[in-house]
Amino acid sequence: MGCFCAVPEEFYCEVLLLDESKLTLTTQQQGIKKSTKGSVVLDHVFHHVNLVEIDYFGLRYCDRSHQTYWLDPAKTLAEHKELINTGPPYTLYFGIKFYAEDPCKLKEEITRYQFFLQVKQDVLQGRLPCPVNTAAQLGAYAIQSELGDYDPYKHTAGYVSEYRFVPDQKEELEEAIERIHKTLMGQIPSEAELNYLRTAKSLEMYGVDLHPVYGENKSEYFLGLTPVGVVVYKNKKQVGKYFWPRITKVHFKETQFELRVLGKDCNETSFFFEARSKTACKHLWKCSVEHHTFFRMPENESNSLSRKLSKFGSIRYKHRYSGRTALQMSRDLSIQLPRPDQNVTRSRSKTYPKRIAQTQPAESNSISRITANMENGENEGTIKIIAPSPVKSFKKAKNENSPDTQRSKSHAPWEENGPQSGLYNSPSDRTKSPKFPYTRRRNPSCGSDNDSVQPVRRRKAHNSGEDSDLKQRRRSRSRCNTSSGSESENSNREYRKKRNRIRQENDMVDSAPQWEAVLRRQKEKNQADPNNRRSRHRSRSRSPDIQAKEELWKHIQKELVDPSGLSEEQLKEIPYTKIETQGDPIRIRHSHSPRSYRQYRRSQCSDGERSVLSEVNSKTDLVPPLPVTRSSDAQGSGDATVHQRRNGSKDSLMEEKPQTSTNNLAGKHTAKTIKTIQASRLKTET
């Protein structure tokens, strides 16, 4: 009956280190139970890593809502309720808790190496943004520490692409890293890592522990805890900075966080922020107290330290930092550092397939990439696991029973190399799922999302209900595991690919006859429907102009008048037509628009007589037509004709007098006169 009242003390934990290796802690091997203090677990990890400067480091874990916590050395494992609710097995992440203000002053090489691994991980995950030139410099130092001096025989073109240094790494950055790496000849790994830390510590976001909060009007802010104080960010810009000596009180109540600062005029000002949950607010308060204690309090007496911490306490909550401060660590003479004959074991970083030249065909690129991925997966014995970022988004906690939460506990609860939720991500990116960024699946056979959303796959009906249930259970199991990089997921993915290939092969249909039938119907419809004809220029019927020309020529009389035998008075009495024109000249439009061209042609051809005269004059070399506004027939004397010629008026046109031509052979004078009636132009032929 003792089994009903006994408390299970078995404990199985995996610690993920900064070099991407695992340390397993169990009750059978290390004797760790749930009643064991957190300090014992820390000692096992520090002994495994061979660390002496241990106060900079800690163990972090996540609850089911992805809220991060630091393992409290003074509490037992059972008192960490959030950790116990996640297992077994339990997962802890080893990392830097307090970033040294100057990591180059760390005494031991192994400590600097752990800082190097942590900062390199921060740059890779986007928590430590840096410009391109700085990223190239950091990448070159990392390559020098990893591979040593540049060797043209060993390091062929594209060797830098096998490693990852920044998010969304580009080929231009890899070329810059390769150029700088060639100039770092002679640097040993410890020297290259020291130069890496010297460059990284000058970045603005180095050592900043970010916590997302809300300000007034629900505007998003980030509070960053640094070695020198608290910084406030809004829209990726620093809007406030408060040094630890100026901060007089840190307080929280429910989800409200208060930061009281002493101004230059000795007046205290309180700044209030809203956390996304009570647990997040309490975690922010604890981290603030510990940072202030570690970087600001050099006193060694416990009473003075407790008195200082009491000012930062909140109602019903007391938190005390039990470790040493940064000043105490620098003045500690009990251990001679660095230790003599210290040997640092460095692990190799994870490699990726080499970048393929862009000049190769796309098909060979995809085949080579798939082959390289398969070889890489077969050769590697471990899976890369990245420690969690302390900055989380404002997304609501997922349902514990949802498929996304039912993942392997040996992997970090976020996507590897996915978009990180933090300061340098837009709000839309922070609220978007890294694994499923789109809310609707796209139809492979359609060109856009607006097309048909009917599923392409055709499922055959099963005759047996047992087979249908078996298929359903297989699909359910394939959806349950969503962990990144797990073997079960890879096997499920291969199974889905194989199943899709089989289904696609069974469902192939020859659509050529159907497509030809559709084209034939469209062609017949276009031929039957005259409205579907399309032409660039509209063709106009010429029949009205031809009829008007024939009708007009009936009224044009061409009569020859023989002037011989006529007196001078009779010559003056030969009838003629006087036509006067008024109005503006015709404007010629130069437009390439078919519509304006049609309107211009329509206006030009609206007057039948005007269009007919244009064609007649073009054939008979007549004067170009002018708009006719008034016509009057007059018979005048020759003096009037001469007077009209002398005036040379542009607005009037008069028929010339009949001229006589002398025939040298016959000795006679003949004159030919063309007499026009109701015409817009006259011409005298001699």
UniProtKB/Swiss-Prot annotation:
UniProt xrefs under Pfam families: FA, FERM_C, FERM_M, FERM_N
Stretches for region Disordered: 331-686
Positions with biased composition (Low complexity): 479-489
Cell compartment(s), UniProt: Cytoplasm, Cytoskeleton
Gene Ontology CC, one term: cytoplasm
Gene Ontology terms, MF aspect: cytoskeletal protein binding
Listed Basic and acidic residues bias regions: 518-527, 547-561, 648-658
GO terms for biological process, alphabetical: actomyosin structure organization
Biased composition annotated in UniProt, kind: Polar residues: 357-376, 418-428, 673-686
Keywords: Cytoplasm, Cytoskeleton, Phosphoprotein
Main localization category: cytoplasm
Tissue expression from the record: Expressed in many tissues. High levels of expression in brain, liver, thymus and peripheral blood leukocytes and low levels of expression in heart, kidney, testis and colon.
Biased composition (Basic residues): 588-601
Domain FERM: 11-299
PTM-bearing positions, type Phosphoserine: 304, 389, 393, 402
Alphabetized InterPro entries for the sequence: Band4.1-like4A_FERM_F1, Band_41_domain, Ez/rad/moesin-like, FA, FERM/acyl-CoA-bd_prot_sf, FERM_2, FERM_central, FERM_CS
Superkingdom of the organism of origin: Eukaryota
SMART domains: B41, FA, FERM_C
Protein name: Band 4.1-like protein 4A
